[in-house]
């Protein structure tokens, strides 16, 4: 599959996440500073789409990704548990979206609803890290239609969270097979003084303050869980924020701890 960065103006790339994992696709779109439309074939109708502008997701519309807005509001404490379940039941009974029901009953301020949309959009994209057989199509140059709700997300935190949570080991296995025992230095492209991947204070402190060189083993020895250490190093490597210090041998691939989630049948 050709790299998304090499797409021609107005061009189209069609593939599946098994051939072109979502982590690599998101970073390729970011690296290429691309604007366009990403269709995800979760449903026979063309209704699951992500719009990008200058490499960044700016509108996420994935009704078939299986993430409930009402449950996000419950989990974040924005609505009481029973009220949230009532909203969910009303949406299911009426055939409307949860968002339409919430807006009709005017239970949230616009700011709270916007934040819930962003949380849902992030959760939807992270969930797709396990949808390895899923087909997609990216069309370069397609602009965001007027009136479409904005859900602007940063790609680097999406990649890190997706690598931590996914059961599909494709991306981390590629790294392990090549660099499991390699050592690295942070590249000058890594922005010091910020947390570009939204690792959180503990991970950010270990990665940036641990005396070089960096490796999966050294991050784990410094107290990070193995899956967090692996996701942090892999995301840095994918984002071209590591410089190889010493090439070490790879290891055998990890097996998935659970079968990857598959999209619903048409």
Segments and roles (model prediction):
Residues 1-266:
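Acidic, Ser/Thr/Pro-enriched low-complexity segments and adjacent helix/loop capping patches
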């Amino acid at each position: 599959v050709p790299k998304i960065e090499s797409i021609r103006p107005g061009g189209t790339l069609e593939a599946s996440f098994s051939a072109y994992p979502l982590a690599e696709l998101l970073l390729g779109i970011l690296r290429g500073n691309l604007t366009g439309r990403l269709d995800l074939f979760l449903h026979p109708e063309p209704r699951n789409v992500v719009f990008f502008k200058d490499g960044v997701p700016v509108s996420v519309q994935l009704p078939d990704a299986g993430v409930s807005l009402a449950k996000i509001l419950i989990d974040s404490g924005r609505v009481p548990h029973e009220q949230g379940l009532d909203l969910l039941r009303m949406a299911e009974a009426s055939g409307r979206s949860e968002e339409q029901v919430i807006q009709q009953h005017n239970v949230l301020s616009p700011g709270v609803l916007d934040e819930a949309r962003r949380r849902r959009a992030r959760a939807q994209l992270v969930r797709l890290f396990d949808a390895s057989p899923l087909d997609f199509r990216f069309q370069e140059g397609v602009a965001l239609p007027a009136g479409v709700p904005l859900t602007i997300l940063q790609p680097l935190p999406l990649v890190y969270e997706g690598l931590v949570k996914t059961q599909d080991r494709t991306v981390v296995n590629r790294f392990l097979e090549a660099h499991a025992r390699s050592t690295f230095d942070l590249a000058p492209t890594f922005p010091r003084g910020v947390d570009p991947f939204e690792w959180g204070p503990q991970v950010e402190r270990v990665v940036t303050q641990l005396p070089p060189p960096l490796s999966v083993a050294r991050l784990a020895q410094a107290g990070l869980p193995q899956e967090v250490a692996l996701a942090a190093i892999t995301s840095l490597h994918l984002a071209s924020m590591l410089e190889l210090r010493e090439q070490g041998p790879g290891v055998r691939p990890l097996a998935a701890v659970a079968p990857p989630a598959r999209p619903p049948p048409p």
